Regions:
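Helix-turn-helix DNA-binding elements, focusing on the entry/boundary residues of the two helices
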Residues: 5, 16, 27, 42-45
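Key DNA-contact positions within bacterial/archaeal DNA-binding proteins
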Residues: 17, 27-31, 57
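DNA major-groove recognition helix of helix-turn-helix/homeodomain DNA-binding modules
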Residues: 43-58
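Short basic helix-loop element that most often maps to the first helix and adjoining turn
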Residues: 3-22
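Recognition helix of helix-turn-helix/homeodomain-like DNA-binding domains
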Residues: 25-39
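Phosphate-coordinating loops and pocket residues in cytosolic domains that bind phosphorylated ligands
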Residues: 61
Length: 62
């Protein structure tokens, strides 16, 4: 599970539905990203980082 991704989303006050809409993906797909069941494309990662106003290291490096 990507706890950092979920934590950052919650910190920004966004729902999975809002993130999915902004990324133009289904809520189920976004949920799989947060659970670590599906890998994101580079384009999706970049959109997500912009949306969450953070750096790659903030979410994906441990």
């Amino acid at each position: 599970m990507n706890l950092k991704l979920r934590a950052k989303r919650v910190e920004k006050g966004l729902t999975q539905e809002e993130i999915a809409k902004e990324l133009n993906i289904s809520v189920a797909t976004y949920n799989r990203y947060e659970k670590g069941h599906t890998e994101m494309t580079e384009t999706t990662i970049n959109k997500l980082l912009t949306l969450l106003e953070c750096k790659y290291e903030d979410i994906f490096l441990y």
